[in-house]
Amino acid sequence: MSEFFESSAFLGVTVSLLSYAFGSFLKKKFKTGIFNPLLISIVITIVFLLYCNIDYDTYNDGAKYLSWLLTPATACLAIPLYQQIELLKKNHKVVLFGILSGVLTSLTTIMVLAIIFKLSHKEYVTLLPKSITTAIGMGVSEELGGYVTITVAVIVITGVLGNILADGICKIFKINHPIAKGIAIGTSSHAIGTAKAMELGEVEGAMSSLSIAVSGILTVLGAIIFAHII
């Protein structure tokens, strides 16, 4: 069976799309954040590759083409932001302060946990970019000397958790303002969380999209500083 799949140039694309489609079906049917399409697709893909004894490189020969769509997809996040540009102008100080607070909270939390659990410096810097988009996070981790592959995994996990828990956490802490919701989600769980923000509303999606870019820049600068604290 593995020989049949390995001979197909579209193995990665097919498995990825079908598993994600199945995850989307489950989420629509059960209407719960636990059935996150990305999380479901990751689990299905891993199980499939292990069962069919297919190595990652063979899978990635086809799946890499989907990665090429990441940049234009990210650029499309500017559309809801443009549609809410007047709202952004009126609240620019609050927005920037909120994003800065989120970035500092993330970096400080990682530093404190690294001290408590006595992580090595390499392990510590690996976690610093956990809340920003993968493309930026990989560069930060590599520059600081972290484990890039682990950084990617942590970023994905952070995003999935944000996507699943964001709405519930906002309700628990009574965060009702759409701008506050968008900033909180985008700053803490990047593009994956932004998908959830867009489900909540247009304003939430726009503010979350902005937060991805701004928090990415601030985290790059902040990570360099925090990396030299411990």
Question: Language-model features: where?
Answer:
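Helical membrane-embedded segments and adjacent short helical loop/helix-boundary regions
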Residues: 2-16, 20-82, 87-98, 102
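Juxtamembrane boundary at the C-terminal end of a transmembrane helix
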Residues: 221-230
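Transmembrane alpha-helices that form the ion-translocation and gating core
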Residues: 97-133, 158-173
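Alpha-helical membrane segments and immediately flanking helix-loop junctions
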Residues: 123-150, 156-157, 172, 176-214
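Short alpha-helical transmembrane interface motifs in multi-pass membrane proteins
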Residues: 7-8, 59-60, 93-95, 121-122, ...
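Small-residue-rich segments of transmembrane alpha-helices in multi-pass membrane proteins
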Residues: 39-51, 71-74, 97-110, 128-138, ...
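Hydrophobic/small/kink-forming positions within alpha-helical transmembrane segments
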Residues: 13, 17-18, 104, 156, ...
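Helix-loop-helix hairpins and the membrane-proximal interhelical loops
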Residues: 80-92, 115-116, 139-154, 172, ...
